[in-house]
């Protein structure tokens, strides 16, 4: 048994030198500058594939030599923290660069494009082993990263002409059909500050309001509502005088002749409110300002005598550009506290909003004339007042109303 252990121990002593002294495989000589270099190799189904490239060779992460130490204040040597670095080397090898003679007129510390190295993390020189070569590489490294090419300064010339929704007058001519052509065909000539709301650029001519008779005829109907739901309307005096008696209760009903309204400004200038901005009246119930005492007036006339049978009321709504024709832009909005009607735009009031009616609770069934007037008191100058009135024939049965023959009328 002792002899077997001795033989095993001597065999291991003879086998270890054989492993250490075995000749290692010779390393391949460095590739010549500009030669193809194998960068990626893989095997699939017994076949070996290689991807060759002339680009820079990727060097794996390296750690600093473990023998590199830094002296302490007490004289003892302490190992520096090992920082992994990622070195990207150019296509030229070290031996090829060593054989390249340096010109006499070039300074020794001047970096060359072919010998630059970029480090992914911080690197400090050390005094061990190849410290001199690392210090040389550190000197040749650029102190700052290269500037990114996609960080461009802001440009002010790439904005489009006509890309300002608050400036419908985008051409310097006097054509009232402004902004008719495509506004994205030519670049903006210079920096142009966007003006505020309600600003007119050149107000040549006058506005011209025209109500839409077909819009009224298509959606006229009768509705009954309780006084409880008409509190806001009663605050703005949109009901007949009988609705304000002391004996009227919240569950009493009123009969309303509802109809929509759409007014277009077909002139060449903005239709602006007659009252100055500081005198606009705030209505907390509807949460908007009334900028005119009377923008529209609604009357119900007898068909034969033309006598007023229902108490008409003034409608002083909030003026805004609800919609515009193609090529025109909205510039006035009640929510932005700017009121007016731009050329080519419409101020539309649906039939289901407050005060868009005539109170016909005390009207008997029969044939009547519905008269809708815009700018009735001529408080705002217009180019034509003969198209401000719409007259419709109304047949009221006591439960339903039928509108027909709505036309533009001069009176």
UniProtKB/Swiss-Prot annotation:
Cofactor(s), by name: Cu cation; lysine tyrosylquinone residue
Catalysed conversion reaction: L-lysyl-[protein] + O2 + H2O = (S)-2-amino-6-oxohexanoyl-[protein] + H2O2 + NH4(+)
Source species, domain of life: Eukaryota
Modified residues (2',4',5'-topaquinone): 349
Cysteine disulfide links: 232-238, 285-334, 318-324, 345-355, 392-406
One Gene Ontology CC term in the entry: extracellular region
Signal peptide per UniProt: 1-21
Propeptide segment residues: 22-162
Enzyme nomenclature, EC number: 1.4.3.13
Subcellular location: Secreted; Secreted, Extracellular space
Crosslinked residue numbers (Lysine tyrosylquinone (Lys-Tyr)): 314-349
Modified residues (Sulfotyrosine): 181
Similarity field: Belongs to the lysyl oxidase family.
Self-association state and partner proteins as the record states: Interacts with MFAP4. Interacts (via propeptide) with EFEMP2; this interaction is strong and facilitates formation of ternary complexes with ELN during elastic fiber assembly; this interaction limits interaction of EFEMP2 with FBLN5.
Protein name per UniProt: Protein-lysine 6-oxidase
Gene: Lox
